[in-house]
């Protein structure tokens, strides 16, 4: 496929090759990024891209759907087995699309959504004003306590006072485990639906490295590209036949047209991989690496939000630790081929475009084979760069050399994990 692109569109071909080289030559520490396997990438770039077919298996509005029906059925059965749940919709184009479908299925315009404050680790699609979820629904926030942990009693008080129609748990920058059972207790007290958005931790849940929301959340949404190592896409899970029927009607014809069958095939491949024994080892290593990585910074006196991690990510308070904002830290590290992202922290005083924090994650480099030793090296390099603030040409050259050795020893195409 890429060869044909090169022959017919040299400009795009060159940019694809440059991006591939960039990924291979840089250390990827963005918590929401990962490396899909060759099988997933191959499945995502097939003749399935040519096929259109609205509806669901056996109930399409177009002919010629024999094989795509089988593919979608396989994807559904695999993800149901993976999460031990009764119903699944694998058609959502993204995690935000999945959330939009849930809101449309269960809520009326103006209904109340209770989610974690964005600065504290929530997500735009959890009721934030500039997002559709805050435009069509009334977003209410809960917050972390003084130790930067979920305060379930405080959340319950807010819920009892505001009477939300939907409560969301599941985050983009929260490094501790979530008590889904406690959230369900809160939801039941106010007769609210409970949505678990597990976009970041889906792989960890499937591998038994984080408690599962199945049996507690009325409905579950996720992306497929993060810790699941699949293609970019979304999914919706539920144990309720009634909710499943509502979701199916909203996904199509409610908010989407024809599914991306090439992506559904790639999802199916990723789900199969996640059912393999090695995937549990991989996710266990993600968690070990993150805990070790965070502890290395803590030893150096660096402030980590909530003082550690129990999943795949953590956030450094770079403003108090290095007298840098998140944007400055991100740019500094990218200058030596280490890719991170600026991130807000609880009670952040800086704008989301600047931030006081820097979020770090271990899934991508764990995919390439990094273990505790390599993450110790990364902590040393990152700490040095952020303390120096201004690197001279020789220092930049030396650090880039260290990064090059690591990326060469742990290439993407020879990932430690199948």
Swiss-Prot record:
Keyword Cytoplasm belongs to the record: yes
S-S bonds: none
N6-(pyridoxal phosphate)lysine PTM positions: 226
Keywords on record: Cytoplasm, One-carbon metabolism, Pyridoxal phosphate, Transferase
Enzyme class: transferase
First and last residue of the signal peptide: none
Catalytic activity, EC: 2.1.2.1
UniProt record similarity statement: Belongs to the SHMT family.
Role played: Catalyzes the reversible interconversion of serine and glycine with tetrahydrofolate (THF) serving as the one-carbon carrier. This reaction serves as the major source of one-carbon groups required for the biosynthesis of purines, thymidylate, methionine, and other important biomolecules.
Protein known as: Probable serine hydroxymethyltransferase
